[in-house]
Amino acid sequence: MANAAKTITVEQIGSAIRRHHSQRATLIGLNLNKIGRTAELQDTPEVRGMITKVQHLVRIVDEK
């Protein structure tokens, strides 16, 4: 399993209401659209950058 991709699970903890449209688009890109939803994503630099952009709205639940 040398090629097994690492995954990261994120949960939305903040609302997208009254946020900039680019932050809303980032949440949609992370497959999140409601508070309490979780998404399991590949752990790539691109995804990490998206999480950093909306770090006040999401939390990392698990890293595998």
Swiss-Prot record:
SUPFAM superfamilies (alphabetical): Ribosomal protein L30p/L7e
GO molecular-function terms, A-Z: structural constituent of ribosome
Keywords from the UniProt entry: Ribonucleoprotein, Ribosomal protein
GO cellular component, as recorded: cytosolic large ribosomal subunit
Pfam families named in the record: Ribosomal_L30 (PF00327)
Gene Ontology biological process terms, A to Z: translation
Keyword match Ribosomal protein: yes
Domain of life from the UniProt record: Bacteria
Keyword Ribonucleoprotein among record annotations: yes
Subunit structure of this chain's protein: Part of the 50S ribosomal subunit.
Protein family (similarity comment): Belongs to the universal ribosomal protein uL30 family.
Protein name per Swiss-Prot or TrEMBL: Large ribosomal subunit protein uL30
Organism: Rhodopseudomonas palustris (strain BisB18)
Lineage: Bacteria, Pseudomonadati, Pseudomonadota, Alphaproteobacteria, Hyphomicrobiales
Gene assigned in the entry: rpmD
